[in-house]
Amino acid sequence: MGPHIFFRVEDEDSRARYSDEEGLFAEDTDTWVNFKSRDRRLLGQVERHLDWGNRVPTPFISMYCDEGVAHREAERRVGEGKKDVRVYKINMRKSDERREYRNIRLLAERLDFDIPEHAWNNSEYEYIFLHHVPYSAVVDWIDL
């Protein structure tokens, strides 16, 4: 069983967004995804999500299972001049809905693809969630 506490870093340019009283939403909530698949479609979706230059919406929301990693990422963004930097704390045991999520390194290994160099360091702690994380799971946040 994986972790149940996660941290989402968001800023003015984040593709996935928090909505008051609804939760966190991926930019694309319509695309069907089967995490158990090994087909090229899933691989393409995950690769696009990890490509920071990609402008095509993806059905994923990135989060970290390590608070220190999330806060370092948030501080990096502040240092780059990003505005509206916020770290959300997510407790999936508080969620009133079941959600699907996977560790990015384990998924990359199963799909046999290389994580981009710029994303490698944090990927050990990174999880991608499918479509939506309900408001009930968002237990706290801090603004930087």
PLM regions: where:
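NAD-dependent ADP-ribosyltransferases
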Residues: 1-144
